[in-house]
Every structure is written in structure tokens, then in C-alpha cells.
Amino acid sequence: MSDDIHGDIHLPVLLERCIELLAPALQEPGAVIVDATLGMGGHSAGILARFPQATLVGLDRDPDALAIAGERLARFGDRVHLVHTVYDGIREALDGLGIAEVQGVLFDLGVSSLQLDRVERGFSYSKDAPLDMRMDGTSDLTAERVLAEYPEADLRRIFRDYGEEKLAARYAQRIVAARQQGPITRSGELVHLLQRATPAAIARQGHPAKRVFQALRIEVNQELAVLERALPAAVDALAVGGRLVVESYQSLEDRIVKRELQTRSRSSAPAGLPVELPEHRPELRLLIRGAELADDDEKAANPRAAPVRLRAAERTRASEDRRGS
């Protein structure tokens, strides 16, 4: 972007579409939008500029991202509140600010541009770096520790479940054998090991490290477990008429998002009940049928949008246990 204050800031994915989906909920005075995955603040800057009456609560587990976003969003003054937390801490973050409910929540899931582009973070299999992969550098678990300490069965499970890797058993076995000779500390070492363990026919189908690196990143940061807690918390934080927008980038995330939104957009009335009681009515109304993908123009302008799956919903009724009800 031409007005970026940092050279490594990239175009936010589907910004205009996210704004369009959030707009009906953010028109009212005093509207609060939670950017649950703040990153470097690209989506937030666009939203705050478009809705001058809105207040932002930005959450991120990465202190580096918070620092960059804080500088980028400084021009919006006291309309911005940034919180260092993982996004399943949304309720606690809002309570700390004295906010009972919000008009919008945005999730832009997965690894951020900042984390991918900074080689020393170890997220990329295309550059040699320490095997770190922590989104929050203050946390303890690293990819190096996972490779050094996890039993073979756990490595196999992680590669299979989080990477959907067909060679999970083979890779886990080779890693355990290799670490007997010395620790695997760098991404280049791991890539070389995986390449040697991959049959040529399979290697031609794609980079052998892609799924393993995804699996390690998800394990280190507990991304799927956090998402499963964060989505219900986000829905519960929405005021009636508030909107939730979620961008996911791989099928494991999208399945969780799809399940949560579909479940809460259906009646919970028991089968055979002659009348649907108010407490059984759907809490959400889906705003998009299925998942929306980036069009060719978006992908050409912003290649990072290629794998995105966008889902959105509107809050239609409050939970029975909503505070203040």
C-alpha cells in the first residue's frame, strides 16, 4: 500500500467485501468492532476510516504485530484499544475494557504476512531458519521442542490430523530416527529430511514440507483448539444485529467455522415439538451461502487471497444467559 509505514505491510485480504458485510452493524453511533486477529492492522485501518463513529478492539498474540498495528492506527486516537491476547480471550478482553457487547467481530485466520515474511520466525519451509513457529514469542513451545520431545505416535497424529499428510507415519519415523543422532533445530534440516523420505512420485505432487510445516505451526500455537473456543465466545459477544465475518485459509479451519455457524443458525427445538419456543430459535442468520472465494481480480491484486474462504453471519437473538438479560 502506498501509505504504508512499514515496507512489509501487505494488502488486507478481501477488505472491501469484509467492510460490506460488516457495514449494516457498524453504522450506529458507538459501534464497537473487534478485530480478533489484528496482525499489522490492515483490515482495522480500512474499517476505522470507513466508519468514523466506530471504536476498535484489536486482539493479537504477537507483540511485534501489536507494535506495528499500534503505530499504523495511532491516527485514530482513542478509538483504538489494543490487547495482547489470543483470540479465544475475546470475552476477557472486552470485560477488561468494560464492554458488554459489540456490533462486529472479524477473524482473519492463519499465519500473518509479518510472520511469514520474517525468516527468523521459522514459518516458511522455503527459507532456512530456526524451527520456532511461535506466533507469540513469549510462549514456551516451539517447533524444535515438538520435534525433539514428542513421541513418534504424537508426531504421526499431528502430521495426519493437522497436516492431512498421507506420509505421516513415515515422516514421524524418520524424524525420531534422525533426532537420535542430534537435535533438528533448523527448517532447512527438516526440509532436507522430509525430501529424502518422500518417494519421487509423491514429491512431484507438491513440496513435501508444506503439510508438515502447517501441522507443526498448528500444534505450536494450538490454532484449532483456540478457534473452537473463540468462535462461540465471539458469537456470544455480539449484540443482536451484530455481524461476524471469518476468513480462513485451509480446510481444517473452515470446517470448524462452518460447523459453528451452521449449528447456531438452526433451530434447537427437539424433534416433534409442536411449537418452536423463543429459546430454540436460531441465534444466527447466515449472510453467505457456503463459503465465498476471492475472484480473479482480487487474486491478481493480492496473491495471498488465493486460498481464502469467507463466511459471515448476523446475530438474530441473544442467548438466554446473556449478561444483563
Swiss-Prot record:
The lineage of its organism: Bacteria, Bacillati, Actinomycetota, Actinomycetes, Micrococcales. Specifically methylates the N4 position of cytidine in position 1402 (C1402) of 16S rRNA. Signal peptide: none annotated. Residues 311-325 have a biased composition (Basic and acidic residues). The keyword Oxidoreductase does not apply. It comes from the Bacteria. It comes from Leifsonia xyli subsp. xyli (strain CTCB07). It catalyses: cytidine(1402) in 16S rRNA + S-adenosyl-L-methionine = N(4)-methylcytidine(1402) in 16S rRNA + S-adenosyl-L-homocysteine + H(+). Keywords: Cytoplasm, Methyltransferase, rRNA processing, S-adenosyl-L-methionine, Transferase. It is an enzyme of class 2 (transferase). It is found in: Cytoplasm. The keyword Lipid metabolism does not apply. SUPFAM superfamilies: Putative methyltransferase TM0872, insert domain, S-adenosyl-L-methionine-dependent methyltransferases. This is Ribosomal RNA small subunit methyltransferase H. One of its GO terms (biological process) is rRNA base methylation. Pfam families: Methyltransf_5. S-adenosyl-L-methionine binds at G41, G42, H43, D60, Y87, D108, Q115. Its EC number is 2.1.1.199.
